[in-house]
A protein has these predicted regions:
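Surface-facing alpha-helical segments and adjacent helix-coil boundary elements at the starts of domains
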Residues: 1-272
C-alpha cells in the first residue's frame, strides 16, 4: 500500500476520492479520514469483504444486502443501523454474539466499528450501565465517525433512563479523555443533531446541571463546543434557565474557556 494513502487529507467531494482509496475503504483495509469519505462507503461491498472473515454466514450477508437495497433512504446512518439491526437479530441468541462484537469493535475500518455500537446498544439483555462500560472504547475512539455513532446508538436508552444516565455520566465528566467528557453532553443534548429530542431536558434542563457544572471551564475546545451547543439547544425552550446560568458562570468562572462556552450558549438568545 502506498504510504501516502495513510497520510492523505481526504477529498472534499465524493467524485474526487481516488479510485484506489475508495477501493481500500470498501474492502475495510483503511479508515476514512473525513466526512466525505465516510459518506462514500458502499456498505454492501464493505460487509461482503469483511464479514466472511468474521465467520458471518453467506445467508446472513445476503439478508443484510437485501435489506440495504430495500432502504427508502440509503444514507450512511440508515445503512449502519440497518446492517447492525440484521446482525443483532441473527446473533442475539447465539453463543457467538460476544465473539462477533469483539471482532466488530476492534476492526481497522471505522465503519465496521460503527456497526459494533448499534450491535451492542440494541441488546435488551444488557443493562445501560454495562452498555456504557462495554462501549467506552468506542465512545473514546480516535475516529470522529465512531464517536458520533456511539452516542446516537445509546440515545434512546439514555432518554428512557435519564436519571441514571445523568448520574453515571456525571462521573465520566472527570475522565482524562476529552472524547469521554464530550460524550457526556453530546449524548444528552436536549435537541441534538440527526436524532430524536429529549423532551424532559427541553423542559427541565436543570436536571443535567451536575454534568454541565463539571464542564463549564473544560480545557478542550471539543468539549466546550458540545457544552455550548447543549445550552443553545436548551435556550430554545428555556431561555430563562440558560440566561441565568450563563450570568452565574461569568461571575464564578472568569476563564476564557467559560467565556467561549457562554458565547456559544447565548447565540440564539442574542439573535432575538
Amino acid at each position: 500500500m502506498n504510504p501516502e494513502i495513510l497520510h492523505r487529507k481526504g477529498a472534499i467531494k465524493i467524485e474526487n476520492i481516488p479510485t484506489e482509496v475508495l477501493k481500500l475503504l470498501n474492502l475495510g483495509y483503511i479508515e476514512t479520514v473525513n466526512l466525505t469519505e465516510w459518506l462514500a462507503i458502499d456498505h454492501s461491498v464493505l460487509l461482503g469483504s469483511v464479514f466472511p472473515e468474521m465467520g458471518v454466514s453467506e445467508e446472513i450477508i445476503l439478508q443484510i444486502t437485501s435489506s440495504l437495497k430495500q432502504q427508502k433512504k440509503a444514507s450512511a446512518m440508515n445503512s449502519i443501523r440497518n446492517v447492525s439491526s440484521v446482525l443483532y437479530r441473527e446473533y442475539m441468541s447465539s453463543s457467538d454474539y460476544e465473539i462477533l462484537f469483539q471482532k466488530l469493535k476492534s476492526h481497522v475500518s471505522d465503519s465496521i466499528r460503527c456497526y459494533a455500537t448499534y450491535f451492542l446498544a440494541l441488546n435488551e439483555n444488557i443493562s445501560l450501565k454495562d452498555k456504557f462500560i462495554q462501549l467506552e472504547p468506542l465512545i473514546a475512539d480516535t475516529h470522529f465517525g465512531v464517536r458520533e455513532v456511539a452516542w446516537m446508538a445509546l440515545r434512546k436508552d439514555i432518554n428512557d433512563n435519564l436519571d441514571f444516565s445523568i448520574k453515571f455520566l456525571t462521573n465520566w465528566t472527570e475522565s482524562e479523555n476529552e472524547n469521554i467528557r464530550r460524550f457526556c453532553t453530546e449524548s444528552t443534548r436536549p435537541r441534538g443533531v440527526w436524532c430524536s429530542h429529549i423532551d424532559e431536558l427541553k423542559e427541565k434542563p436543570e436536571l443535567a446541571l451536575s454534568i454541565l457544572e463539571k464542564l463549564k471551564s473544560d480545557s478542550s475546545k471539543y468539549v466546550q463546543d458540545s457544552v455550548g451547543n447543549w445550552l443553545n439547544d436548551a435556550s430554545k425552550t428555556r431561555p430563562d434557565f440558560v440566561t441565568q446560568l450563563c450570568e452565574r458562570w461569568e461571575k464564578e468562572s472568569q476563564t476564557k474557556n467559560t467565556q467561549y462556552i457562554v458565547r456559544k450558549a447565548l447565540r440564539t438568545i442574542l439573535k432575538g
